[in-house]
Amino acid sequence: GGMTAIKALIMRDQDRAAPRGTGDVKVGGNYASSIWSLEAAHKQGFSNVLYLDAATHSKVEEFGAANFFGIKNNTYVTPKSSSILPSITNKSLRQIAADLGLTVEERDIPVEELATFEEAGACGTAAVISPIGALYDLDNNVTYDFGMKVGETCKKMYNHLQGIQYGRVEDVHNWNVVVM
């Protein structure tokens, strides 16, 4: 695939979604609330913004328009929260990770745990996977560096999902529908 690792900013002073709000549904207001943050991040040279939970700002939630996942110890880890949009792409990647022999965990991810991931990514419909090369927490002067080279697990998952989408890999889960 044509993936390139990106740099993203951890946003602590803006929230993507309110607790008990509409973060788990696809509505324009969720995207509108992240426009200022993304513009500010772009001005500082970052490609994306990672939001934390609005209640405590201590747990990873998601990017403005994509879910977060991390890879460590042969495990695919993604946040579980009522304010995160349930992503079909993330659901597909969780299944593919399991198919590839990884353990899959949906759970709270404390910000400090970012330091333990070998790979990280943003996943969604448009890019499937945008590998994260580094996450910058400017408020705490911490950089979580995953390497600007795309990780092997991200590559495998991306190629597998793309292979299913384009008919190069057997669709054992019956995800594809022929439309005539």
Language-model features: locations:
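Helix-start/capping segments and mature chain N-termini
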Residues: 1-180
